[in-house]
């Protein structure tokens, strides 16, 4: 399923990433994204940088939210507790009642499938995202140009490139890309990861 569904947790998110996000006016949230496109359904779960003014950025602690964009309704959000003793107990009791009703009525569900069309699943490599990339590079003439060249040769357009910290021989840079297909981005990352002038690719995070 790896080439169809993107699944990534938050274990690689660091305090430095959170600090950079804050400087950019963003926060980092673990999002599940489902999108209907002409090429198929996008289905993925991963961390994303999201603008601090976006409604999802305010969802914290035991709360969860579902943010929807419709043709007529535009943007709307459903928000509530998704963890804790009482919310969990409420969900469990609701499931028990459903099971009992189904047994009494000799059925396996009171609402049938409402699907009316078959939709292909869009492959991960074809999904477009913006990316935040943080890396440690050699602090010498020509390194930034080489990095930019690798991105360009792999159809990755750079929106911003910032040099934030210098630590002796190495400098830390942050790159924000324009929207790009994941397969092109991964090709660029593979090449950069093998270059001697790149000490480390510290983080790659999608941007909402």
Task: Please tell me what each predicted stretch does.
Residues 1-5:
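Short, small-residue-biased leader/transition segments that mark boundaries at the very start
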Residues 7-9, 22-24, 44-48, 55-57, ...:
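A short linear-motif detector with a strong N-terminal bias
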Residues 9-16, 63, 83, 87-94, ...:
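Conserved active-site and cofactor/substrate-binding residues in soluble primary-metabolism enzymes
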Residues 13-16, 21-23, 75-83, 149-158, ...:
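Short secondary-structure transition/capping segments
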Residues 21, 28-30, 43-45, 66-68, ...:
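Generic structural hydrophobic/aromatic packing signal, biased to beta-strands
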Residues 35, 41-138:
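Catalytic, metal-anchored helix/loop core of enzyme active sites in primary metabolism
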Residues 96-208:
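A conserved regulatory-domain signal marking ACT and ACT-like small-molecule sensing domains
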